[in-house]
Amino acid sequence: ADKKDSDVLLFLDGYDTFLTDSLEEISYRFTGYSERIIFSSERFCWPDERLSTELRKRNENQKTPYQYLNSGMYMGRIGDLKKLFASPISNDADDQLYVQLQYLTGEHSMELDVEGYTFITHEPQAVKYKGQLYNPLTNCFSCAYHGNGGESAKTKLASLYNDFYGLTYIPTKRYEILSDDILLIDFMSEDMCR
């Protein structure tokens, strides 16, 4: 409630994304887009391949393989995002399909990051180069990575994450089961687990 409609919100999927640059750099890059909401993009049209032709037509830059909206990383002004997500999405609905359909209406100021200027979705050739996330297919240095996809995507995600941050592991010697879906680990308080 303390956020204004003019504030910028950055959304990243929780378990298969990580940042490779600062929030300041991401915010700076956001100001360079002509549209008010920016979504990551990917190679494959999922979950409904029948939308592929329509989705491709919406992109000015057709030169990259990343032509399809991916809802795993996006940013925009809060007021614009409120309008985009004004219609409720049921728990069993696909949020990516919802956003793709909203994008196709043309009613929202939305753009796909087809060059990976800010966001890169799973790309086997992406590497850490001179301390930054680099996509040789687009010659862009990006700010965030999303390892969306199957086992090979998760392997690439882990490899890139390790290149940027090294293996991070906090050894846990004991834990307490608080409920079916909550564990209390010795370096966390009970309040942190609720």
Locations of regions flagged by a protein language model:
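Catalytic core and acceptor-binding pocket of nucleotide-sugar-dependent glycosyltransferases
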Residues: Y66-L183, M188
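Short aromatic/hydrophobic "clamp" motif used to bind/position activated sugar donors
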Residues: L9
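Short hydrophobic/aromatic segments of transmembrane alpha-helices and their interfaces
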Residues: D2, T64-P65
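Short, high-confidence coil segments that cap the C-terminus of an alpha-helix
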Residues: K4-S6, Y33-R36, C140-S142
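Short acidic donor-binding/metal-coordinating loop in glycosyltransferase active sites
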Residues: G14-D16
